[in-house]
Amino acid sequence: MQLSSSFPISPPKIFPSTKHHKPPVITHQLAAQIQSNRRHFVSPVKVSGYFSSISRAIEEEEEYRKARAAVNRKGVELESYAIEGISVGGHETCVIVPELKCVFDIGRCPSRAIQQKFLFITHAHLDHIGGLPMYVASRGLYNLEPPKIFVPPSIKEDVEKLLEIHRTMGQVELNVELIPLAVGETYELRNDIVVRPFATHHVIPSQGYVIYSVRKKLQKQYAHLKGKQIEKIKKSGVEITDTILSPEIAFTGDTTSEYMLDPRNADALRAKVLITEATFLDESFSTEHAQALGHTHISQIIENAKWIRSKTVLLTHFSSRYHVEEIREAVLKLQSKVSAKVIPLTEGFRSRYS
């Protein structure tokens, strides 16, 4: 006899059976009930084959949930800075610090980069600069002020040509302030923030950037004076304070590990947050291979870890061949060698469970 769909008794969701069945989908409520039952149920047969399958399903579901949560994270909070973005070797790199209105490289121009006023380009490979015209055009579309884009001086002319081509093809203005900034030069972003490039080593011209906070400190010889006395000296035109630059965030872009051995890059290695690449993570690629491609193997960071004085290291630019779990395993090896907290930027990477 065929039952109508309006039959008042719903069929049970799980039918006990001695036959092998694919483990059912376990809801959180059912999982909790099963775990509770198992704590209070005593039997000579501790776990039947069926309940063993349920237990495995619970464990696998929890692993999957954790892995997906790790993959879906959009950003991290590091040393009071919210840092977000994506950096997949050879595909795209764009790291954003909203608090400072800064973007390091533009990748394919993710939408959340458009609101940031300052863009720092490390080098001219497409996975780092490809979205530049879109970034400029999008700011114009939203009636935002023209961005300030900082580039290595060697590529300024070519970037201008690139923008001019898009102006011609799209018949648009593309308003921008393009600033060539050489290694060692300093540019004031705000009255309390400056930027200074540092030398990196890639297969084409490249440079990293350090963002510094700026504060004024009263010179020692005036420390004993009272407020009115200090004000009087200031009005006379005498400089009574020293300018203190503190490295906050350093971004390397693509580079070999050689930058870590350059004493002129000490500020990058003592910034509160060091954002550095680690393209290769395992023994299937040698350090020589990484060096030839202008990249860094994580073993080279481990080897030179003694030079790192940063509070936090954010690793980026992993090869797309790696899963999130492999990245985290490699990070643990580095973490054991440095006092800094080591965090991987894993947006854009797949989990083994996805």
Curated annotation (Swiss-Prot):
Q: Source organism's superkingdom?
A: Eukaryota
Q: Which InterPro entries match?
A: Metallo-B-lactamas, RibonucZ/Hydroxyglut_hydro
Q: Where is the region Disordered? A: 1-21
MF terms in GO: 3'-tRNA processing endoribonuclease activity; metal ion binding
Predominant location category: plastid
Phenotype upon knockout?
Answer: Embryonic lethality when homozygous.
Q: Could you tell me in which tissues this protein is expressed?
A: Highly expressed in green and actively dividing tissues.
List cellular component terms (GO). chloroplast
Looking at the keywords, is Plastid present? yes
**Cofactor dependency:** Zn(2+); Ca(2+); Mn(2+); Mg(2+)
Family matches, as Gene3D superfamilies = Ribonuclease Z/Hydroxyacylglutathione hydrolase-like
Short name of any one Pfam family annotated for the protein:
Lactamase_B_2
Complexes and interactors: Homodimer.
Q: What is the protein named? A: tRNase Z TRZ2, chloroplastic
Q: Record the organism.
A: Arabidopsis thaliana (Mouse-ear cress)
* Gene of this entry: TRZ2
